């Protein structure tokens, strides 16, 4: 390299845009501000996936044994299983509620619910929600956004374009890939920056195949020109800049000489000081922390970025929430400490320390071994204090406390608690054990899933083609139909509501109360029963048990079905009687010998 190149700086090569540099600085500042939080989450992850204590904080202890009891992991799996069961109790997880008569019409409601149910099933919505639930438990924070997918595959032999999935999709955002202002009034009002690492080929494909993304090709050429300059440079050619850091790469030179590119997507409002212009709800994409490759108004109709966040335990004046496992790490540390201390104590009992006094011949420690000692020689076994063997009791106490504090008691996992219980007590304990699950899942539904589903519907209205075919099951005839849905069919005033945890808890409580009432003397009192509508109770149970689609409840259906059964029984009895009846009388035939007719053979009638 020529001597004139030596001493160059990154800024002289990159020539960063002022706005891009400002966004990059905000990303670095917000990322540094959460390092303590990230260290705490890293410790939790080490305990969750540990196979022994050598990879956890317990490695600092002096114990010889390194057994790890995965209590934290077991609580995590239990919470995830219960959250998933509460969020998706049936195959119809959503319901459309219109804000006017037209939006609440049956055809409109059917089209919207069928379209969204079909897209949720095809796009793997439950799988993505499952991933977000793990973030909800592990990090205490879950993030997601809707995207519109139009997949196309090319047949390698014929060259034919085969259409794939077309429609909205929920996309999980890793809590480690998004930064925001943690002291903002709300997450919706905070600026957000999402970091991603793409290959140069994928970025070029987005520019060529997806013009709707509005990436600027001239900026991509500038990015490639920068990499061509770095291809022939080494560290001795210019001064190192500590300000440029890319996570996942050893240094900036390795990054620029690789096939990867860092992309930062900024969502929010910003004020341009040079021109005095205010930009509201803007989407700005920068690459290499230096160049703006996209700067457009956010295309959604909601007025804010379609990025949604939910926290497990919210903090005052801090948008980073706590998780259910945060307060349990210390107890997990204590459990592993007691387990390995107890194991070392057992080892000292089986292989005790020996104190040798005087002249003692060498011997091998084992059963039946003879030890020869001198006149004043002796071998004394140093027995440890056996109090440590009671550590199992303390471990059980800590495990029970961890389950209770995380809201995951043993009865919620199917383990029976000690003591005799009546049926009412069992039901009461079950409801109490599920209360914290239903509370958290109802909050998850209201704050996270509901706005996310409505945003998926909004992005479908903006991007879908002339029409789409959705699969619908006809409950009357038990056949599958395909409904043609247009953009107008899914355009209405109203909102989608998840009908999982909140409705499941309410319905289960009402059914339990009704069952207990009818089992009591009050419900069996004729004076009370005379004033209770049987039709209303039937319709209520049909709604609570989610049986409307089977049409089990109809006015006086039991009476008509009973009459129909009786008619069939009478018709069957009549047919049987006619079949078993004797033959009729035969007509008399006159003989040739007598002029009198012959007597009838059958009985007289």
What name fits each language-model region?
Residues 1-279, 396-397, 415, 487, ...:
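Extended, helix-rich architectural segments
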Residues 1-67, 136, 144, 150-157, ...:
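C-terminal anchoring/interaction modules
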Residues 160-163, 192-198, 327, 369-371, ...:
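Short intrinsically disordered coil segments
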Residues 108, 115, 306, 373-375, ...:
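Short, flexible segments with low predicted structural confidence
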Residues 91, 95-98, 112-116, 123, ...:
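Generic signal for short, ordered secondary-structure residues
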């Amino acid at each position: 390299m020529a001597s004139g190149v030596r001493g160059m700086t990154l800024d002289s090569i990159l020539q960063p845009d002022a706005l891009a540099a400002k966004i990059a600085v905000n990303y670095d500042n917000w990322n540094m501000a959460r390092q303590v939080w990230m260290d705490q989450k890293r410790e939790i992850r080490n305990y969750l996936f540990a196979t022994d204590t050598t990879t956890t904080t317990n490695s600092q202890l002096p114990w010889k044994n390194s057994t790890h009891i995965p209590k934290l992991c077991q609580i995590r799996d239990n919470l995830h299983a219960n959250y998933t069961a509460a969020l998706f109790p049936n195959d119809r997880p959503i319901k459309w509620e219109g804000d006017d008569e037209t939006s609440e019409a049956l055809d409109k409601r059917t089209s919207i619910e069928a379209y969204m149910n079909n897209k949720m099933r095809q796009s793997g919505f439950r799988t993505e929600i499952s991933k977000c639930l793990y973030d909800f438990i592990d990090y205490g924070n879950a993030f997601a956004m809707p995207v519109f997918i139009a997949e196309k595959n090319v047949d390698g032999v014929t060259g034919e374009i085969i259409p794939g999935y077309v429609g909205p999709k929920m996309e999980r955002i890793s809590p480690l890939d998004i930064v925001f202002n943690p002291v903002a009034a709300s997450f919706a009002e905070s600026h957000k920056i999402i970091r991603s690492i793409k290959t140069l080929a994928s970025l070029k494909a987005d520019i060529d195949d997806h013009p709707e993304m509005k990436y600027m090709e001239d900026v991509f050429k500038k990015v490639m020109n920068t990499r061509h300059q770095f291809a022939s440079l080494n560290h001795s050619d210019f001064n190192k800049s500590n300000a440029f850091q890319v996570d996942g790469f050893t240094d900036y030179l390795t990054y620029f000489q690789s096939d990867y590119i860092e992309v930062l997507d900024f969502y929010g409002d910003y004020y341009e000081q040079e021109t005095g212009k205010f930009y509201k709800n803007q989407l700005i994409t920068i690459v290499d922390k230096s160049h703006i490759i996209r700067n457009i108004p956010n295309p959604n109709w909601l007025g804010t970025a379609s990025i949604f966040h939910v926290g497990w335990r919210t903090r005052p004046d801090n948008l980073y929430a706590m998780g259910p496992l945060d307060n349990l790490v210390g107890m997990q540390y204590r459990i592993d400490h007691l387990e390995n201390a107890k194991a070392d104590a057992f080892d000292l009992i089986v292989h005790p320390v020996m104190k040798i006094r005087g002249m003692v011949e060498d011997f091998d420690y084992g059963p039946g071994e003879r030890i020869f000692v001198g006149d004043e020689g002796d071998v004394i076994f140093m027995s440890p204090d056996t109090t440590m063997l009671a550590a199992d009791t303390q471990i059980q106490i800590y495990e029970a406390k961890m389950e209770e504090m995380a809201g995951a008691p043993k009865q919620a996992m199917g383990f029976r608690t000690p003591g005799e219980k009546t049926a009412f007590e069992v039901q009461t304990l079950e409801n109490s054990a599920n209360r914290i699950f239903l509370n958290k899942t109802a909050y998850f539904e209201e704050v996270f899933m509901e706005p996310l589903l409505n945003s998926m519907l909004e992005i479908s209205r903006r991007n879908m083609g002339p029409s789409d075919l959705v699969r619908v099951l006809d409950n009357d005839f038990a056949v599958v139909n395909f409904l043609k849905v247009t953009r107008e069919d899914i355009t209405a005033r109203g909102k989608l509501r998840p009908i999982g945890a909140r409705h499941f808890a309410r319905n289960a409580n009402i059914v339990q109360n009704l069952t207990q009432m009818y089992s009591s003397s009050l419900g069996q009192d004729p004076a009370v029963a005379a004033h209770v509508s049987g039709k209303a109770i039937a319709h209520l149970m049909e709604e609570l048990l989610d049986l409307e689609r089977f049409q089990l409840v109809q006015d006086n259906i039991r009476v008509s079905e009973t009459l129909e059964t009786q008619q069939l029984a009478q018709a069957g009895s009549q047919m049987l009687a006619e079949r078993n009846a004797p033959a009729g009388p035969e007509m008399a035939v006159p003989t040739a010998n007598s002029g009198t007719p012959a007597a009838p053979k059958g009985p007289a009638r």
